[in-house]
């Protein structure tokens, strides 16, 4: 993903969730996705999809069973 795409994704997340705490980072050797953080906490990955000329982005978040027991 380009720096411009990363910035747009970050701005979108911050606007939708009414915060300024999202961070979007490039992945080291993978160009079709980025890492999403809220403050310092890793949340998941966003993948860029291109199907039949349509570009979209998919968010993938894993929630560990152990994390759910904390609540």
Spell out what each predicted region is.
Residues 1-71:
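Terminal leader/tail segments of proteins
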């Amino acid at each position: 993903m380009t720096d411009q795409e990363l910035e747009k994704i970050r701005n979108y997340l911050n606007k939708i969730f009414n915060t300024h705490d999202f961070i979007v980072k490039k992945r080291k050797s993978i160009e079709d996705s980025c890492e999403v953080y809220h403050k310092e906490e890793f949340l998941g990955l966003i993948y860029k999809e291109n199907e039949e000329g349509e570009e979209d982005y998919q968010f993938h978040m894993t929630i560990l069973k152990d994390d759910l027991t904390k609540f």
